[in-house]
């Protein structure tokens, strides 16, 4: 009990003093996770919109595959990407392994299905009358798509927030592809695992407090925008 209390008190001091080590770790986490979220959004939103808006053969199968990928373990993604970017892999000459770029690639693969699936759900919830009204008023296909996209904007924002919340807390991909290098590829989750192994509970708890605060904020934002879709 004393260990927990002492660690918690020391952790609060570290957070309040903006410890350089913590600032560096949080900065790496936000940079890598933020970049992967932007890339996944640029790919996943158009993909999800196309799947929801268009009618084509195999549409149900594509949606099923995306839903299946939502449960894909991070270690599987890490292993898959590692096989491509390791020295013996196809992309070995690019020297991507144990870099932030490798982490971004893995994290993008992780959350791309999340963005696409949530976008599909957001588009599918839009009343069909919006499409029919737009067509009746003489809107072309592009203008109709814009109307649907505008009405689904809150659901799409919720998709991006959910993706960021998923990726900021992952550890498997960051550990396998980043290598947990101090000041370069060490994220909050990998640092917590390392500090726990070293017995440095204060830093681990401090990072846990920050991560918990981020998760709480992300969840509040997610439910806010998700609620907007019901208005």
What are these regions (language model features)?
Residues 117-130, 135, 142, 146-147, ...:
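C-terminal transmembrane helix and the adjacent membrane-cytosol boundary/short C-terminal tail
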Residues 35-66, 128, 141, 148, ...:
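Transmembrane-helix boundary motif in ABC transporter permease subunits
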Residues 2-13, 20, 77-108, 177-181:
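Membrane-interfacial helix termini and adjacent extracytoplasmic/periplasmic loops
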Residues 22, 26, 30, 62, ...:
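Hydrophobic alpha-helical elements at and bordering transmembrane segments
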């Amino acid at each position: 009990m004393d260990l927990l209390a002492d660690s918690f008190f020391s952790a609060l001091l570290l957070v309040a003093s903006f410890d350089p080590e913590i600032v560096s770790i949080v900065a790496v986490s936000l940079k890598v996770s933020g970049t992967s979220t932007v890339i996944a959004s640029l790919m996943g939103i158009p993909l999800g919109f196309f799947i929801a808006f268009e009618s084509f053969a195999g549409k149900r199968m594509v949606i099923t595959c995306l839903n299946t990928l939502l449960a894909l373990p991070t270690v599987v993604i890490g292993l898959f990407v590692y096989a491509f970017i390791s020295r013996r892999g196809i992309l070995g000459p690019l020297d991507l392994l144990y870099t932030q770029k490798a982490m971004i690639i893995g994290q993008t693969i992780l959350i791309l299905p999340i963005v696409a699936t949530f976008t599909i759900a957001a588009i599918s919830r839009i009343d069909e009358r919006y499409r029919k009204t737009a067509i009746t008023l003489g809107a072309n296909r592009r203008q109709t798509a814009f109307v649907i996209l505008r009405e689904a904007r809150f659901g799409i924002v919720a998709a991006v927030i959910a993706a960021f919340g998923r990726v900021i807390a992952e550890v498997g991909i960051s550990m396998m592809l980043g290598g947990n290098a101090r000041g370069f590829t060490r994220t909050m989750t990998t640092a917590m695992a390392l500090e726990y192994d070293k017995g440095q509970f204060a830093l681990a708890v401090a990072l846990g407090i920050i991560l918990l605060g981020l998760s709480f904020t992300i969840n509040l934002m997610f439910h806010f925008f998700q609620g907007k879709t019901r208005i």
